[in-house]
């Protein structure tokens, strides 16, 4: 993770305001991360995934990724992003050899996107998605499934894979209330998600 900051405010991840993010002295510099990855590469690590927060809110991320791809022994540098500021960087990602990008996208409905993220960035995300498909970079969608929020999107995301060269991964919502007396169990775990998919696609092979 290159930052804990994000330009969206997804309700299941963080409050809408009053956040206290880490200051610069509390996170690794790019130089420190390059040194760390170089050491790990010498030990046999060959793949690196960039995450956040939202990685692209950190200044000079793309030059940093170019440095990562140049490290001997690193065969793949991938990134997970919300896609809001991705489109303009795709040509450079392509030129440096980035082969896979994951976009975090919980709904295909613009109004519902605003309800979930509390930001009006749906058009920007979809523009990034289309540009990514056009670039030939392997594209994946990560969708967190939540009761009463985006169940209709499960089948919609599946239909997307029929027309677009994209992989979709459905993710269980992670509870943030620990495992004590106040623990709220996950209402849509992987088994329930899979069963819901099979209702519409009975010939699905797991």
Describe each region flagged by the PLM.
Residues 27-50, 57-169:
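Radical SAM/AdoMet-radical enzyme domain recognition
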Residues 154, 160-163, 167-206:
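A C-terminal junction/extension of Radical SAM enzymes
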Residues 15-18, 98, 117-121, 198, ...:
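A generic structural signal for secondary-structure junctions
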Residues 1-30:
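Canonical Radical SAM [4Fe-4S] cluster-binding loop centered on the CxxxCxxC motif
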Residues 3-5, 15-16, 51-53, 80-82:
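Acidic/polar N-terminal loop/beta-strand segments that form early-domain functional surfaces
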Residues 17-21, 108-110, 174-178:
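A short, flexible beta-alpha/helix-coil linker loop
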């Amino acid at each position: 993770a290159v930052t804990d900051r994000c330009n969206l405010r997804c309700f299941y991840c963080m409050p809408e305001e009053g956040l206290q993010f880490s200051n610069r002295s509390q996170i690794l510099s790019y130089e420190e991360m390059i040194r760390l990855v170089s050491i790990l590469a010498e030990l046999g690590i060959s793949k690196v995934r960039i995450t956040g927060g939202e990685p692209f809110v950190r200044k000079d991320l793309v030059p940093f990724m170019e440095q990562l791809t140049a490290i001997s022994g690193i065969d793949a540098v991938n990134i997970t992003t919300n896609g809001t500021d991705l489109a303009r960087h795709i040509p450079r990602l392509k030129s440096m050899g980035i082969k896979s990008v994951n976009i975090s996208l919980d709904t295909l409905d613009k109004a519902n996107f605003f309800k979930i993220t509390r930001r009006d960035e749906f058009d920007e995300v979809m523009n990034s998605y289309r540009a990514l498909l056009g670039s030939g970079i392997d594209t994946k969608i990560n969708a967190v499934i939540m009761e009463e929020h985006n169940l209709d999107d499960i089948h919609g995301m599946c239909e997307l894979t029929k027309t677009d060269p994209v992989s979709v991964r459905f993710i269980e919502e992670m509870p943030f209330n620990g495992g004590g007396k106040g623990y709220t169990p996950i209402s849509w775990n992987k088994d329930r998600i899979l069963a819901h998919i099979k209702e519409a696609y009975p010939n699905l092979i797991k």
